[in-house]
Design a protein with these regions (language model features):
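Active-site-adjacent bridging/hinge elements
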Residues: 35, 103-107, 264-268, 287-291, ...
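Core structural elements
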Residues: 93-104, 152-180, 288-291, 316, ...
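Conserved ATP-driven helicase/translocase motor core recognized via long
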Residues: 26, 56, 158-307, 401-403, ...
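Conserved ATP-dependent motor core of P-loop NTPases, especially the RecA-like helicase ATPase domain
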Residues: 16-20, 56-66, 71, 75-237, ...
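Conserved motor-region signature of P-loop NTPase helicases/translocases
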Residues: 1-76, 127, 131, 138, ...
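Conserved helicase/translocase P-loop NTPase motor core
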Residues: 95-102, 129, 222-225, 286-335, ...
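Conserved catalytic motifs of ABC-family nucleotide-binding domains
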Residues: 735-812
């Protein structure tokens, strides 16, 4: 087997088969090709052969598509190397996702494990989880009065907005997901409780006595309230009365601000802990009912003979742990175990894989890139990758043959200037400013790559900042600016089909698409969980509900006739809804379903072409319901309406919409295949399908001429000549009422703050409204000006403080989310081959009645990115980036209002309404 074309690092990976191998593979470094060659080498005579056949190779990757790609590459390479016999065994090889591997093991041992061997895999457990919540609440909800005093049942916000929409149903769903993913299920969950201790708060108020008259008055009132609470019954109502009576004094010359802030932090810690302690019955009830939901969910799965992905991992782990014979069998079966996308695994998956890798894990090869770990929301733990790397590096440093680390840093995808752009942000600048990522794996450009930049006179590295205005105005300005840049590239000869906009989220995808179309550029939304929002998905939904129940016109016939499939307007609907009384001759109203099935229209509303066409298509279709497959009927209606023909004539956008129609029809066919001839059940199943996070339909647009819009996650593994990146820079702070933290032992600690508050009476009998209590409590934790922050937590919080734990969990969540955002930006930028545009924005807030640019480094990357890419000390309107070849226009400031940043003042220069810079034509 010829290895001469491989780089030295690739050759090391391919030929190192006798020890644990850790591969850190940068973006665009050809890792899939290298893994394929490694399998071939292990099968080749030159290696021994190291393996007797593909059945001794286990290759795990993150997605089904990636597994299919590796299988096809292995098959083609085997054929090319003359190993046709081995190529025939590819379909039976252990090349799959980890869930696919688990499913295969469980089916093979189903009877001895007490599992139905015909089990189905529940890809989206959301519906069944919701059903479990609904059943338990309807059956047992009345027994949990304390809980419903803390949280609304569903879909409500607490007074004052403190609940943030938190509800019993949403919390139960969160706890169910956490328990399902835990190694030991619900027993791994532990709710932290507070304690009632106001001694520290009393001491803090005593420290204010005698300083000023105001401070003394505030301290006396607070101490009296605390004394009354300590002497009385410890109830939530009495605690609220005490809490509302404690008003910290204002700082002054004699009462330093630092002392007041410490008092506020002490008060926040004391009252939050006391409230959690006195309300502990509510949080215990939350765990109790969540446990009941967990049991109900498991019973529902058992009744339906389904397992979710967490079950697959947990049951396989338990089977190998508890069955020595199985563990011995699988532990010696594979001579090669390779895990691709290792950065997207979690500890449970690693523990499971360790059963399969032989003594000391010698068979294991892990491949990944910590800088591309962007699936934390699915449970990925990037620290698992880092710990594994550190362990193998330590073994290698000791001269041991127990492990080896290899880095793939040659990037075959991107131009050197793009890689320099990435490095400037994440590794640091030539001027010595440190980058966003510690331990950054820098990539080297491949000298032999073909340059795909067609446009001339355009720098490959560009950025823009939209400042001020509302969130919507900034988004519109951003979209207009990106579209204008793409238009300029197209005018300079750059193919539009190679341009893509990568977004951190898709809520505004249509707004960006409209901006591209306004510039005369075709545009398709090709990736992201937006399928349910498309007109095509809604149109097919209306069709299937019409076929299921013609009389249900609200969700069926009315939207069907109004959509692009039939395009009826007001006159046509009036014709369907108007009849003539045969006896009196007077006109009267009729239901539109009756109008559809009747030919008797009133004078002046007869012979309307759109009505005639709708009747000609839908009447025969309705007559077929119950005789023919519903999916076939729906497909015929779509075709006979002429909709697909019309879409085909609308260019790339029309083809993309047609792909959505076909995806919807396929979903109906799949539902019908599972449910049989049951139109209403098929319609309900399609509704559930829409509730899932579905990407738009896809047609083969190779060589097309449209800008594509997709999420960064959808772009993973892809590459494009021209990339713009937007909505990838900021996060929301982690202020959810329920916070959690997973320990090293797998246990999950929880702290739940209340979502709503009762009214109470003060010591003098005055009525205290619940929303006033909520506003007071909101001051303590979670807000931008909260009284208890990490700055004071060490001074006021005891080691067992639930308030301190919630704060630490919240700040940890925010920090981890921002780190994930850094990695998301890295993935987005490394999709670019020739050109990369970063589109950022920042709000303007009032500081001392002056508008100031608001760059918050704790929740937004924008300020740090600007610091990396702008020349040191440069103004925001300087127009240049920090690179030597930069020229004016590479950076653009779109100021939607006047503002200040540092010592510089900036004047509004852009109008969103006009879509251009002020003064431009």
């Amino acid at each position: 087997m010829d290895l001469s074309t491989l780089m030295p690092q690739q050759r090391d990976i391919v030929t190192t088969l006798d020890r644990k191998l850790f591969v850190s593979a940068g973006a665009g470094s050809g890792k899939t090709f290298t893994l394929t060659r490694r399998i071939l080498w292990a099968l080749s005579p030159e290696s021994g052969p190291f393996v007797d056949g593909l059945d001794q190779v286990l290759a795990i990757t993150f997605t089904k598509d990636a597994a299919a790609e590796i299988r096809e590459r292995v098959r083609a390479a085997l054929v090319a190397e003359g190993m046709e016999r081995a190529a025939l065994s590819v379909d039976d090889a252990w090349i799959s996702t980890i869930h696919g591997m688990c499913s295969r093991i469980l089916r093979a041992h189903a009877l001895e494990l007490g599992i139905d061997p015909e089990f189905s895999v529940l890809e989206d457990p959301g519906d069944l989880m919701d059903l479990a919540v609904e059943r338990v609440l309807s059956r047992e909800g009345s027994a949990y009065g304390d809980l419903f005093g803390w949280y609304p049942l569903a879909g409500e916000s607490a007074p004052g907005g403190f609940g943030g929409g938190t509800s019993v149903t949403s919390l139960l769903r969160v706890l169910l997901e956490k328990a399902s993913a835990a190694r030991n299920g619900f027993s791994d969950l532990r709710m932290l409780q507070g304690s009632v201790n106001l001694d520290g708060l009393a001491d803090a108020y005593r420290g204010c006595m005698g300083i000023t008259a105001g401070a003394t008055k505030a301290a006396e009132a607070a101490l009296a309230a605390i004394e009354a609470f300590e002497a009385g019954e410890k109830t939530v109502g009495n605690l609220i009365a005490c809490m509302m009576a404690c008003k910290p004094p204002r700082s002054s010359k004699n009462l330093p601000k630092e002392q007041v802030n410490l008092l506020k932090a002490e008060q926040a810690d004391a009252f939050v802990n006391a409230y959690l302690a006195l309300g502990s019955r509510a949080t215990q009830q939350l765990l109790e009912i969540a446990h009941a939901v967990f049991d109900e969910y498991n019973q529902l799965k058992f009744d339906r003979s389904v397992l979710d992905n967490n079950d697959l991992l947990r049951l396989t782990y338990q089977a190998l742990r508890d069955n020595p014979a199985m563990r011995e069998d699988y532990g010696s079966r594979f001579k090669m175990v390779m895990i691709d996308e290792f950065q997207d695994t979690d500890q449970q998956q690693v523990d499971l894989i360790n059963f399969l890798t032989g003594e000391g894990g010698r068979a294991l090869c892990t491949v990944g890139d910590a800088q591309q770990s962007i699936y934390r929301f699915r449970g990925a733990e990037v620290d698992v990758f880092r710990r594994a790397q550190a362990q193998v590096e330590a073994a290698a440093a000791c001269g041991s043959d127990a492990g080896r680390v290899v880095q793939l840093v040659k990037n075959f995808r991107s131009h050197a200037e793009i890689l320099d752009y990435v490095a400037a942000i994440f590794d640091g600048t030539p001027q010595g400013r440190g980058g966003l990522m510690q331990g950054f794996l820098n990539l080297q450009a491949h000298d032999g790559r073909k340059d795909g930049m067609v446009a001339t006179g355009v720098n490959r590295r560009q950025a823009l900042l939209v400042a001020g205005g509302s969130t919507q105005e900034r988004a519109q300005a951003r979209a207009q600016a990106i579209a204008r840049r793409f238009r300029e590239l197209a005018d300079a000869g750059q193919p539009v089909g190679g341009m893509v906009l990568l977004l951190g989220g898709m809520p505004r995808a249509n707004m960006y698409a409209d901006a591209f179309r306004a510039q005369g550029l075709d545009c398709v939304i090709s990736g992201g969980s937006v399928f349910a929002q498309t007109q095509e998905a809604a149109a097919v939904r209306a069709l299937v509900w019409t076929l299921a129940n013609l009389a249900d016109t609200a969700q069926g016939l009315a939207p069907l006739l109004a959509c692009d499939m039939f395009s009826l307007g007001a006159q046509e609907f009036l014709a369907l809804a108007t009849a003539k009384d045969e006896q009196t001759g007077e006109t009267r109203r009729r239901n539109i379903d009756a109008g559809l099935m009747s030919d008797k229209d009133v004078d002046g509303l007869r012979d309307l072409p759109l009505v005639d066409r709708a009747r000609a298509v839908l009447r025969p279709a309705l007559s077929r319901v119950g005789r023919d497959p519903l999916a076939a009927i729906a497909r015929d209606v779509v075709n006979q309406s002429g909709w697909m023909v019309r879409l085909a004539g609308q260019g790339a956008e029309g083809r993309a919409r047609a792909a959505n129609v076909l995806k919807a029809l396929d979903a109906i066919a799949e539902a019908e295949a599972q449910l049989g001839a049951a139109p209403r059940q098929v319609a309900l199943a399609y509704d559930r399908f829409l509730e899932g996070k579905q990407a738009p339909g896809a047609l083969n647009e190779e060589g097309g001429n449209a800008v594509r819009i997709m999420t960064v996650h959808a772009s993973k593994g892809l590459e494009f000549p021209v990339v713009a990146v937007a909505e990838c820079f900021s996060i929301k702070s982690g202020n959810a009422k329920l916070q959690s933290l997973r320990g090293d032992d797998g246990s999950i600690s929880l702290v739940a703050l209340p979502g709503q508050f009762p009214s109470a009476r003060s010591a003098d009998g005055a009525y205290i409204k619940g929303d006033d209590v909520a506003k007071e409590f909101k001051k303590y934790l979670g807000g931008s000006s909260a009284w208890l922050t990490s700055e004071y937590a060490d001074d006021v919080c005891a080691s067992d403080s639930a308030a301190g734990a919630w704060l630490a969990m919240s700040e940890c969540e925010t920090r981890l989310e921002l780190q994930e955002r850094e990695r998301l930006l890295y993935v987005a930028m490394t999709r670019a081959r020739e050109y990369c545009l970063l589109a950022m924005d920042a709000p303007v807030r009032s500081v001392n009645k002056q508008p100031v640019l608001d760059l918050r480094d704790d929740t937004d990357l924008t300020g740090r990115v600007l610091e990396q890419i702008l020349p040191a000390g440069a103004a925001l309107n300087g127009g240049m980036l920090c690179f030597e070849d930069s020229r004016r226009g590479d950076f653009e400031l779109l100021a939607l209002q006047d503002f200040a940043c540092g010592d510089a003042a900036y004047t509004q220069n852009y109008s969103v309404e006009d879509g251009c810079f002020i003064g431009e034509d």
